[in-house]
A protein has these predicted regions:
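Cytosolic ligand/metal-binding cores
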Residues: 2-32, 37, 138-161, 250-329, ...
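Short beta-strand scaffold segments in enzyme catalytic cores
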Residues: 133-135, 234, 241, 246-248, ...
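Non-catalytic accessory segments adjacent to catalytic cores
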Residues: 2-11, 89-209, 305-308, 441
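A residue-level signal for conserved active-site and pocket-lining positions in enzyme catalytic cores
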Residues: 114, 135, 197, 249, ...
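Active-site pocket-lining segments that scaffold enzyme catalytic pockets across diverse folds
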Residues: 164-247, 289-294, 298-301, 305, ...
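A short glycine-rich, hydrophobically flanked beta-strand micro-motif that places a catalytic Asp/Glu
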Residues: 55-57, 112-116, 233-238, 373-381
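Conserved hydrophobic core element of enzyme catalytic domains
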Residues: 330-443
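An N-terminal JmjN-like helical accessory module and its immediate linker preceding a catalytic domain
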Residues: 2-81
């Protein structure tokens, strides 16, 4: 239990499932204070210049969300049980925390920002970051949370707009693990395996290498992405930066929602032409098939945790600045006290980023992509002390090299089904690189 305002509130639920031994996990004594503040400016403009790209955190959509800086605590894990280890660690932190929260809203009090690798055997594993300072906005309400360890809070501060970040200099892009032509050949091979009955769908990703003459400032990327892609969740956690249109799971007071995207077409910039393309996307048997696999996998994963799950009969077309997606919002009422992170673990990897059947598609990805996805297509987001939170899928993103911040890897992927055309899939992947490429070269 921990103190919130003048109330004693139970901390994270304790599922009955067996957890890894927690004896080796240190339990820090965390203290947090949340107060209401006047709106200090656009959230992303408050992020200060720091010693490295991993020192800022953000989760913002249309001006609302959370930003943080500094590190009061951090946790890393790897392996198949990385989600369980992270959940156990956060629960132990919350159990021993002393919190004064004047608002008691989702995202107030102590918050952990997190990102998780796509693959269980990736060395990138899991990272949870608890910033020293968090500023949040929800509607007209704004708040400041300061967090410290061993009863030491950061000194009093008033959030203010920071000097603007600098643009990257002399940005250069080059092929990653595979060239475009090589990746197209991999897609053709995957289609052959699908037509042979090995699987129904596989999501194949590719990467681009980025080199610059200066350190890449995640604040620059965040601000450029937010300006152009206001219908996405703009994020940075531990040097991973992007703008995802796909909410893996949002949990608030027992209601869980998940936005599923699968099926994509590139926009032309001509409104009339784009409306016609949207109509064709909504009728495309190839894209509808791909979308159905993704929706079914999310609904099946949520069902054991919920008393009911609502799945709309047909998807809608989500219009972004550069592409359009088939989208479905799945919702349910959670009855087993699962946290947002536990639900994210149940959903990952969904058919939207892996394929169908998932175990077979996962093996095919390892064989065909010839790279480690790192945290691309893994869960990214935040969780508060109650277990509520928001976890997106790390899409339209890149990872800044912690050893050399002038370097970065960008990622994009496409769902491959029996009707996929390699050249069209390559063009789609190029379109999905556009948000990060444009953000890097906007200066």
């Amino acid at each position: 239990m921990f103190v919130v305002g003048l109330l004693l509130v139970t901390s994270l639920p304790r599922p009955e499932a067996t957890r890894p031994d927690s004896s080796a996990v240190p339990v820090p004594a965390l203290v947090a204070r949340t107060i209401a503040i006047e709106r200090p400016g656009a959230l992303l403009s408050l992020l200060p210049e720091t010693s490295g790209p991993d020192q800022v955190s953000a989760w913002v959509r249309r001006g609302e969300g959370l930003v943080g800086w500094g590190r009061a605590l951090e946790f890393r894990a790897s392996g198949q049980d990385r989600f369980a280890k992270a959940q156990m660690w956060w629960r132990s932190v919350v159990d021993h925390a002393v919190v004064r929260d004047d608002l008691i809203l989702p995202g107030t009090g102590p918050v952990a920002f997190g990102s998780f690798s796509f693959s269980a055997d990736s060395p990138f594993g899991a990272a949870l970051v608890v910033p020293e300072v968090i500023v949040g906005q929800r509607g007209s309400q704004c708040w400041l949370t300061t967090i410290g360890v061993d009863s030491h809070l950061p000194g009093s501060l008033t959030p203010s707009v920071a000097p603007p970040p600098a643009a990257p200099q002399d940005v250069r892009f080059s092929d990653g693990a595979l060239s475009g032509a090589q990746w197209s050949a991999v897609v053709a091979h995957a289609v052959g395996r699908i037509n042979a009955g090995e699987m129904d769908k596989v999501v194949l990703a590719r990467d681009l290498a980025v080199d610059t003459r200066s350190a890449i400032d995640p604040r620059w990327l965040l601000q450029r992405l937010a300006e152009r892609y206001d219908n996405t969740w703009v994020f940075t956690v531990d040097g991973l930066v992007g703008a995802t249109p796909e909410m893996l799971v949002k949990l608030e007071k027992g209601l869980v929602t998940s936005r599923v995207l699968a099926g994509t077409i590139r926009r032309t910039g001509n409104d009339e032409r784009d409306l016609a393309l949207a109509a064709s996307l909504a009728r495309s048997s190839k894209d509808l098939e791909e979308h159905e696999y993704a929706v079914r996998s999310v609904a099946d994963a949520l069902t054991p945790h919920c008393s009911s799950v609502n799945v709309p009969e047909s998807p809608f077309v989500l219009h972004l600045s550069n592409v359009m997606h088939l989208a479905t919002d799945v919702a349910g009422v959670v009855t087993d006290h699962s946290t947002s992170l536990a639900l994210a673990a149940s959903l990952h990897p969904s058919a939207a980023v892996c394929g169908t059947p998932t175990p077979i598609a996962n093996v095919a990805i390892r064989e065909l992509e010839q790279m480690d996805r790192g945290r691309y297509a893994g869960p990214v987001g935040w969780m508060d002390a109650t277990g509520d939170g928001e976890w997106g899928i790390a899409l339209r993103c890149g990872s800044i090299d912690p050893a050399d911040p002038s370097r970065m890897r960008l990622f994009a992927g496409c769902g491959i089904v029996s009707g996929s055309d390699p050249d069209s899939e390559l063009a789609e992947s190029d379109a999905k690189f556009v948000p990060m490429r444009d953000a890097l070269t906007a200066g």
